[in-house]
Amino acid sequence: MQYNLTRIDPDAPNDQYPIGERETVSDPLEDQVHKNIYMGKLEDVLSGAVNWGRKNSLWPYNFGLSCCYVEMTTAFTAPHDIARFGAEVIRASPRQADFMVIAGTCFIKMAPIIQRLYEQMLEPKWVISMGSCANSGGMYDIYSVVQGVDKFLPVDVYVPGCPPRPEAFLQGLMLLQESIGKERRPLSWVVGDQGVYRAEMPSQKEQRREQRIAVTNLRSPDEV
């Protein structure tokens, strides 16, 4: 599996975001996994256990921008029970949150505030873009709406829909957990170059393309 290695670039200008450089590398542990004797650091062996704890204890930051936030909060109710995935502990401060959900329309005036909140979150941190407006601006192709939050934030998971159902948000959370389980990052909080390895996760559209092309009998609107 290929990984995206992100390193902080200290010589980058201050107005560049994200401040860092990326390159595609192979799994740093792949060469050692199939050997009888493992020659490496103990922290590399513990990465799997630590990632398991991280992905099953994700604390979301409680804020929303528009109607998609209503669908997000619905996932916390009893019928959907987001506590099954360990993400029911909503935090009111970004300093205590693990991931941020951009749920709704992101206006240009709101973009610097969202970026400031993201910068206040401690590593490790992740971002879920929920809904068409957050993904690409949605129906608002106008000057006042940012055409996708990935213009100024590193997005880990995109959840399509206008608005997405709570089940779609839960599926996006599961995809984020899968991605976190394959990450390689330091086991402690450090300042500076962290050398974070993120797995290259193919999109669901690419994974299900052959299955959808093979469909010959389309359902009528009455059967949907």
From Swiss-Prot:
Enzyme class label = translocase
Give positions of region: Disordered: 201-224
Q: Which Gene3D superfamilies match?
A: 3.40.50.12280
InterPro entries xref list: NADH_UbQ_OxRdtase-like_20kDa, NADH_UQ_OxRdtase_20Kd_su
Q: Cite the entry's keywords alphabetically.
A: 4Fe-4S, Cell inner membrane, Cell membrane, Iron, Iron-sulfur, Membrane, Metal-binding, NAD, Quinone, Translocase, Transport, Ubiquinone
Where in or outside the cell is it found?
A: Cell inner membrane
Q: Which GO biological process categories is it annotated with?
A: aerobic respiration; electron transport coupled proton transport
Q: How does it sit in the membrane?
A: Peripheral membrane protein
Q: Which GO terms describe its molecular function?
A: 4 iron, 4 sulfur cluster binding; iron ion binding; NADH dehydrogenase (ubiquinone) activity; NADH:ubiquinone reductase (non-electrogenic) activity; quinone binding
Kindly state which reaction or reactions the protein catalyses. a quinone + NADH + 5 H(+)(in) = a quinol + NAD(+) + 4 H(+)(out)
EC number assigned by the record:
7.1.1.-
Cofactor list: [4Fe-4S] cluster
Output a single Gene Ontology CC term carried by this record.
respiratory chain complex I
| Transmembrane intervals | none
Entry's cofactor comment:
Binds 1 [4Fe-4S] cluster.
Q: Which PANTHER family match?
A: NADH DEHYDROGENASE, NADH DEHYDROGENASE [UBIQUINONE] IRON-SULFUR PROTEIN 7, MITOCHONDRIAL
Q: What does this protein do?
A: NDH-1 shuttles electrons from NADH, via FMN and iron-sulfur (Fe-S) centers, to quinones in the respiratory chain. The immediate electron acceptor for the enzyme in this species is believed to be ubiquinone. Couples the redox reaction to proton translocation (for every two electrons transferred, four hydrogen ions are translocated across the cytoplasmic membrane), and thus conserves the redox energy in a proton gradient.
What family is reported?
A: Belongs to the complex I 20 kDa subunit family.
Record text on subunit structure and interactions: NDH-1 is composed of 13 different subunits. Subunits NuoB, CD, E, F, and G constitute the peripheral sector of the complex.
**Know the name of this protein?**
NADH-quinone oxidoreductase subunit B
